[in-house]
Design a protein with these regions (language model features):
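The feature marks the mature, well-folded catalytic cores of soluble enzymes
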Residues: 2-416
């Protein structure tokens, strides 16, 4: 976390864009919970591969150090430990995970409760389970927690607690609900939707699919993780309780390479977005539905960029992987589209996607090595566009990039 000013850390949430100057962001450094993922269960835990905990933590630490040059950065585990000292928050957390908490004293130290909630609690099992060396969990660990984008979204000064598609991530919803309800740093105008408590059949919403593009414009991917029913629920809440008047729904393929909208599209400047070309031009382009608060019905557009033009956001694409299809596929798989903007025209990206970085340079960005940026060997000019790179060879094996690993809760305004 950056040093506090004399007035203390910023409190309260507000997100009105994907690119506004970052002020406060939440992260989770991957830890021992990664050790539960094995070749036989990796798909159940939603992983593409097995991660080395130490390497993943080091690479995540480099990303966090870069973020700290721009904003206050908070570890989710630190905030969770603090809310466990709030009686109402502790009661909520324990009531929502009774299988394991019923076996422990409610007076357990906050840091021990944090360990249980994040690293899980292994079941003692019975005679047969012990004999066969088969481990089970009364509370499953959360190896996906470092992809903190998914369990919650801030829209304006309101919060959406996700309704995660897969049960292995449901505890993440409970944690984020407790934090946004009880931590003063995250004070807000109310919960728009509470996926931890309001779960309904076929209703799912995940943060990787929700992009606050402007104060009045939200784009959502209808994907394998975010359902039509979830989007309908979100639409009603947005149009009745926020300043959002335009909702753009991208009809996504049900495919592992594009589980969320942010795997194929991220905004990096006022008029630029990094995008996966096959889904935005040619025969496989993804239709986008435009819903407006002021009218009934739905308008269908050829793709998201066309729909954005209708709401006065004329974005140009920077194509992930450049112009060659094979390289586009390889770099999209390696989270080449999954950038995270810290201010207009400055974004974080993995260093491995060289053709994507070249495409960004052609669009006016300078590729800046993250280590050189941190040591001061390379500086970024005030009006200069830059993409700051860091090594993500281990992190990417989990299936996400910088946007996936960050939950911004406060950004400054954008001068459009």
């Amino acid at each position: 976390m950056v040093p506090e000013s004399s007035s203390g850390p910023r409190e309260g949430v507000r997100i009105t864009s994907e690119i506004g100057p970052l002020e406060t962001v939440l992260c989770h450094t991957p830890g021992p919970e990664l050790g539960v993922v094995t070749p036989s269960n990796r798909e159940s835990y939603l992983f593409n591969d097995l991660l080395d905990q130490d390497k993943a933590a080091r690479q995540h630490g480099r990303m966090r150090a870069i973020l700290e040059r721009f904003a206050e950065v908070y570890e989710i585990s630190d905030l969770l430990e603090e809310v466990f000292d709030v009686p109402e928050a502790r009661r909520y957390l324990l009531e929502h995970r009774p299988d394991v908490t019923g076996e422990k004293s409610p007076d357990l130290a906050p840091e021990e409760w944090v360990r249980v909630f994040i690293e899980g609690e292994e079941s003692s099992g019975g005679t047969l389970a012990s004999l066969l060396n088969e481990a089970g969990y009364t509370l499953p660990p959360l190896p996906n927690l470092f992809f903190l984008r998914d369990p919650a979204v801030v829209i304006g000064d309101r919060v959406v607690v996700a309704a995660m598609q897969h049960e292995v991530r449901w505890t993440e919803e409970v944690i984020l609900r407790a934090l946004f309800s009880h931590h003063p740093l995250l004070s807000n105008g109310g919960i728009l939707y509470d996926g931890a408590d309001e779960r309904r059949m076929n209703t799912s919403i995940e943060g990787g699919d929700v992009h606050v593009l402007r104060e009045d414009v939200v784009a959502v991917g209808m994907s394998e993780r975010t359902s039509a029913a979830g989007i309908d629920t979100l639409r009603r809440a947005l149009f009745s309780r926020t300043d959002v008047t335009e909702l753009l729904v991208v009809l996504m393929p049900r495919h592992r390479t594009s589980i969320h909208l942010d795997m194929i599209f991220t905004m990096v400047d006022r008029e630029l977005a990094c995008a996966y070309a096959p889904y935005f031009r040619g025969p496989k382009r993804l239709p986008t539905l435009h819903l407006r608060a002021s009218e009934e019905g739905v308008r269908e557009k050829a793709d998201l960029f066309e729909a954005l033009g209708d709401v006065g956001m004329d974005l140009s694409p920077i194509y992930c992987g450049g112009g060659g299809r094979t390289v586009q596929e390889r770099e999209q798989w390696a989270s080449g589209c999954n950038l995270f903007a810290v201010e207009p025209g400055t974004a974080l990206a993995y260093d491995r996607n060289e053709h994507t970085l070249s495409a960004m340079e052609e669009a006016g960005f300078r590729a800046v090595d993250g280590v050189e940026f941190l040591t001061g060997d390379t500086e970024i000019g005030g009006d200069e566009r830059a993409v700051i790179t860091f090594e993500g060879s281990e992190l990417v094996r989990g299936g996400g990039g910088p946007r996936c690993m960050t939950l911004p809760v406060r950004r400054g305004p954008v001068a459009w």
